[in-house]
């Protein structure tokens, strides 16, 4: 009791001292805005001349310098590419001086000042990067509005070190500095967005419209007050509070898709903002919608190596499967956002809400040549899905005793991934090939019989998926700024955060079982309009064909393959969607529950308690030092199912036995030290160094204690609740050169990653093991240290020094080179060639690149703006990378890495071009033209092969053209 009393007395004395300090010293505060458009200037420099005292403006252009002794000072406002201003002020004891600044763009060599949107956007991004306390890349609001990107993922990929994972021809997820999407964190105003994936921790960024964003930040080196689970880095979408006066904008556009030869794409957005009650209350509301055609066509193939090796010992690869695919897909996006802020006498309170939704309607028709099994299949799939993300946040900032800075936040967010209806119908032709072909794609197609009279209904699936992730967060931070004379300033800061996650994954399947046509015919319930082979009791595929033809299929390929069934080299009639729906309605009583998918169901709880302490020191306005440590405790609880399936001759699960609920729990503590050093070498150059430790938690489904034991097929699969968290030491160095004409940076980084997890498949030879003799697939932590080494160059420049009309050119370019090494667990079975021919399993490793790590990345953008006209052409080159399978079946732990390098799968290199042309009409209106994927680039994957790469997929998505109008008021 005495110790508690002494502690309280001590705290009161400290707070009283702070209060006295606040009363004897003063402060200066205000806002900096752009003279051209009245918009706030974030991350501008505000300094007390002749000292190292100063600060930078926040996201809304506000600044505050506290703890000033009474006296006269000169306040300096500076912002790259803008005129520097100096203002004399007098600070009184306990007083507050309000001084706002309106900054103008600086002229070059006597030329008339021409302020363009491109130049303003570039200046904003440069100032943010140069004045940041950590290593960060930025896309400003102005640049976002200048780009033709369809979603936030595409815009993030403009930054150095970022590569895209594409789906439907557009970016959906991002790989940061060679680390796959699951290793990175996505936030809105610092609040983490829940994962949208059904297996891992990745976030689908395609549902976020760029219309609602005020900026995008890519943090490459973490600070102790940031979430620690971001080995690749953190992407933060920023919003802002309302500025003065009623303002708004609206945009509408429509477009054309060259692949589908269809008009009808559209996109629209609207936003309003204003301040009320003497600027005390600010409100921003906005929303938007989009319809996008994401259809595609192409083919995929798989290879086998059953022929063994050639004379040189190289594996012989032959084609086992060829699939021709046409997807007709439309995506609808909806977004809404609102920000309400209240200014207090000594602080502020802000409520923000962001909502995003993507609806996908897809019809896929696929022709499958299964030469390895001597049959051909045609299948039809109709899928409807909805992805939603909602993030609500209430936060406050308060100044206490004139010295302390307190901020707090509470948030609720959720993500959901629902597929309420996925219907798949499959037809099969047995003995589908005239002879054993030479196993090339062309040979397989030529050898196919294409016999419609022997192509019959195999089965129908009707699936539903429901994944939901709810997150609750509370946090508070306390900061104490201090000064040691006029040349040293800094702060100490500490805080805590608690986040609880609850996640549910539920999958259901109804199916007809195999040979459903035979059952229907046996019951005498066949439709009289069907084509039926009564001898074999087959319901023929011709019963489900319609009047729709895909005569343009493969017109963008050198090859000429045909999707529709039939013997002629034409695209015959396609499976009719309405006839598939009618079958589901008329024969609903033939559907039964498929129990195996229940093994994919799980419930997960995750609680993370975090705390940190850090300090920052600035010496002589030259050296900035930040040091601190973060602590995170993770408590996991999972619930799933164990079971043994019984399968038919195709390996399809018929029923389940021995279903048992299983649970798993885990607690893990981790400490994350972090160090940052910034050296301002001159007024136009600085050097930054950082050494930080970060972590990454395993995929949800890897931690779930599910298990399936299939003795009929001699395999078992399971999750691993005791997987270790990954941890990484990250070392960064970046040199920045900046001035009126832009920014040039040279950066390098090195990452050492421990306990990265992969999938191991091995045979169980321990007689005491319950699954003795089976092949077991499970996630394991890899041995050895995985490493990533990278080099980045980033140029953002303008040509204002050139005479008119060439002074309207703006250039952005960045290049990234990456190298990585990781160690994949593999299992080798060795059998003695003499009696008793016993076998042993050798679990070993092989080295290779990190999955998703691209060797080379290049972004180039050249823009021109003059007298209301602007144009920008941009290019993104993305080199090869190990393939990351985003379509892995739930419950199947798959990987893209083979047991030997020749079996590795790769995503091919792509070069993509986009074009934007704009023309202002009067002051408020602007016409624009967007052309995406100018060259209709093919997206391909390969298998490494023994001698040459072998093509495993080849898809095109078409060029899209959009025209529209923007209105600002």
Labelled PLM ranges:
Residues 66-67, 192-220:
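Short acidic/polar hinge/loop motifs at secondary-structure boundaries
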Residues 27, 261-364, 381-395, 400-401, ...:
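Transmembrane beta-barrel wall of Gram-negative outer-membrane proteins
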Residues 33, 37, 44-49, 78-82, ...:
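Short, acidic, small-residue-rich periplasmic hinge/interaction motif at the N-terminus
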Residues 153-192:
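Extracytoplasmic beta-strand/coil segments of soluble accessory domains associated
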